[in-house]
Amino acid sequence: MHSNSYEPNFVLSKTNKKHTDMDRKDFLKKGLLGTGMFVASASLGNTMKNEIDEIEPLEPIGYNHLPNPDSKIKDNSVIHKADTRGKADHGWLVSNHTFSFANYHNPERMHFGVLRVLNDDKVEAGRGFGTHPHDNMEIISIPLEGDLEHKDSMGNTAIIKSGDIQVMSAGTGIMHSEFNKNNDQSVKFLQIWVYPNKRNVTPRYDQITLDKTKSKNKFQQILSPNPDDEGVWIHQDAWFHLGNFENSTETNYQVKKKGNGVYAFIIKGSAEIEGQKLEERDGFGVWDISDLQIKATSENTEILIMDVPMMM
């Protein structure tokens, strides 16, 4: 959603966004080794040019993580405890990275299948991310608290808040900014990047407001590959679901496509998934299965399920 590094001279208050072309180039090179980002040179006018490394077209990317030795299903799962995530604290921004991002690099935590970025962000009042570029990435934002103001190079201006979901297909290239709309409270949101199954598509933006009654003690689909399905859609065979559960509620999740894995993120509360105990902000990935048994172990447990291809 925002750029893949956090430098104070780049991401500033609304009243101070000046930066140099060289700063921007150095800034971009720090994150994701160029994946999902491009440099828009002022000398090119409105022409957007990729100047840093790109993803190789649809090469297998594997699982890229170690098996979870504590899991009851062991060799086909991985657990990422909340306190093991990478962290960036710039005062105005606190971001926790499940996977390698910006200055946090862990070769054992680069991605889960096509799920490349899962950032848990908190931005202070009136602050945010100045205009910056992306290309060839599906970018999903899920606000948890507060209001986030979005502007982009396609002419979209929007406010997203808790209960909404936002998606951008960066495709051939998009510029956007995101700011905390409020001057008296922080905004918290999840930023998720998914590798697309089609490159250089026409950029697009969408957002919807979810009917939260549909996620009471069950999973509500919020994202899929199909524009006609419930929720937003992306260029990938991925499905996202949100559920809000009372204590001791049990449910079963059916994997949507053979070859997909499931990455579960506990937004709040606690749960057991396939017998694995998980607390708030823990992540748990599992593959080579057809379904998952899930049990909430506290009141008001909120779980995000990301059902994604394990190979490209």
Locations of the language-model features?
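Short acidic-glycine-tyrosine-enriched beta hairpin
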Residues: 154-169, 275-290
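A short glycine-rich, His/Asp/Glu-containing loop-to-beta-strand
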Residues: 88-133, 137-138, 189, 196, ...
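N-terminal secretory signal peptides
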Residues: 1-26
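C-terminal segment of N-terminal export signals and the immediately downstream linker at the start
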Residues: 22, 43-74
